[in-house]
């Protein structure tokens, strides 16, 4: 019995609420990828950390910095200020993990209370491979959630299941063969956009 599926990927977020084993609502972030996985990856690289090591640092944070739910441009300046004030990498990483979740819950999904998600929550998307993001979600939402081993490829897995279900014997695909793909050619040219 699942109440909600929260998917945070590298560029987008999705919240799928389930009622009576049926999709009740789907919410997506709009244009901005603020607070998605690419956001954390960028910060990790700027501090010369791999994403994995940066995430591990967060698990040992003593005082995670509060970045709120603002745009990454504003968060960038808050992180820089925290660095000037002597914040540790662990506290910065933990602060970013919390901000990803706060952004998802309070800006994208627009919750007033995280408990509105329900008790049975599945998290997916590559960002949830980050244990600090997972733990931040559990602490903010007040639940223990389920993170599948294949959290980062759940969308592809679902698409494969649908393709298998809809497959018809004898159906000929319209996709190009690998030889046809390798034989493709293209031309390039430089053009200036006249729309700006």
Predicted regions and their residues:
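Conserved phosphate-binding catalytic cores of ATP/NTP-utilizing and phosphoryl-transfer enzymes
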Residues: 1-6, 14-21, 25, 112, ...
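Adenine-nucleotide phosphate-binding core of ATP-dependent small-molecule kinases
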Residues: 77-106
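Glycine-rich phosphate-binding loop plus the immediately following alpha-helix
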Residues: 20-63, 152-155, 161-165
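Phosphate/pyrophosphate-binding loops at sites that engage ATP/ADP/AMP, CoA/4′-phosphopantetheine
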Residues: 2, 104-118
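Acidic, glycine/GT-rich loop-and beta-edge segments that sit at the periphery of enzyme/chaperone cores
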Residues: 14, 165-196
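Active-site nucleophile and cofactor-binding loops and adjacent substrate-binding regions
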Residues: 6-10, 27-35, 95-98, 122-127, ...
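Glycine-rich phosphate-binding loops at beta-strand->alpha-helix junctions
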Residues: 99, 112-140, 151-152
